[in-house]
Amino acid sequence: MRISVLGAGAWGTALASHAAQSHDVVLWGRDAALVAQMAATRANERYLPGIPLHASLRFEAEMSAALDHATGEDALVVIASPVAGLADLTRGVAAHGGVRNVIWLCKGFDPESGALPHAIVAGVLAQTGRADLATGALSGPSFAKEVAQGLPCAMTVASASTALCTRTQRAFHHHAMRVYASDDLVGVEVGGAVKNVLAIATGAADGLGLGLNARAALVTRGLAEMTRLGTALGGRPETFMGLTGMGDLLLTATGDLSRNRTVGMQLAQGRSLDEILAHLGHVAEGVRCARAVAALARAKGVDMPITFAVCEVLFDGLAPSRAVDRLLQRDAKAESVR
């Protein structure tokens, strides 16, 4: 299969190198110097230092050439950008008449409109007259570094197109990666977005030294918040028990490679948000979309106390320790996700 990955950050590079073990893969990056460095050294020293990339992976600095590579039904374009870059890259893909199949990897809500990635893509395709494209999301618990190292992982592709799900499985379900299929695109995307916000909370708890019991409580009640919002938006409850819900939440909330968890830990240690983001070097989607998640919850009448507390810590100056006190002082209630 011919595959073009658009975006040479950590995740795009890792997935492209994985796919290149079995397919004809081109990795496009907008930074020509980075593309040249990867071609010369067979590594992405900026985002995945010290990890060799597959010998057959090819690199391209011209988007038109990368899209030429992925034309026709038996080909796939993968958009590997943060949510903020999704619309622009989708416009570029839509302008190329030969592309038929597109998936994206980003997780989050648009901070301005509150739109999920599939809604952003659908809006662009409607504007450009490309509703013929088969589209979907690939998501799940997967740190880019571990994928690049060839360590095992499992993911989910979500799309209304069974053919696209099957094609995506063929592209990536090999070697150390398993790919499951789902038609619950809303549920898959909500899980991938909300877990980033919740990971900030668990990181803060760990940074405060609150222990493993507190972490378990936050993950479990956070999952309830995710499920409440996701079902209110049209997702299926069982989706949140799977890889893109509980699975991704567990990884992001507890793994030391998690950028969102790192933000929470460092906030608890007294660093300012601006300082943390300046030194992080990567996007922390939980910070970008926390307000959008909270606004959607309030608009839908969904109770999300952990998420609301994260927003107050991030943007209103609430001390993490005070946020914990508030959560602990909430009235007793029956355990429920509703």
Curated annotation (Swiss-Prot):
The keyword Lipid metabolism applies. NADPH binds at W11, R30, K107, A144, R259, V283, E285. Signal peptide: none annotated. SUPFAM superfamilies: 6-phosphogluconate dehydrogenase C-terminal domain-like, NAD(P)-binding Rossmann-fold domains. GO terms for biological process: carbohydrate metabolic process; glycerol-3-phosphate biosynthetic process; glycerol-3-phosphate catabolic process; glycerophospholipid metabolic process; phospholipid biosynthetic process. Pathway: Membrane lipid metabolism; glycerophospholipid metabolism. Keywords: Cytoplasm, Lipid biosynthesis, Lipid metabolism, NAD, NADP, Nucleotide-binding, Oxidoreductase, Phospholipid biosynthesis, Phospholipid metabolism. It comes from the Bacteria. It catalyses: sn-glycerol 3-phosphate + NAD(+) = dihydroxyacetone phosphate + NADH + H(+); sn-glycerol 3-phosphate + NADP(+) = dihydroxyacetone phosphate + NADPH + H(+). NCBIfam families: PRK00094.1-2, PRK00094.1-4. This is Glycerol-3-phosphate dehydrogenase [NAD(P)+].
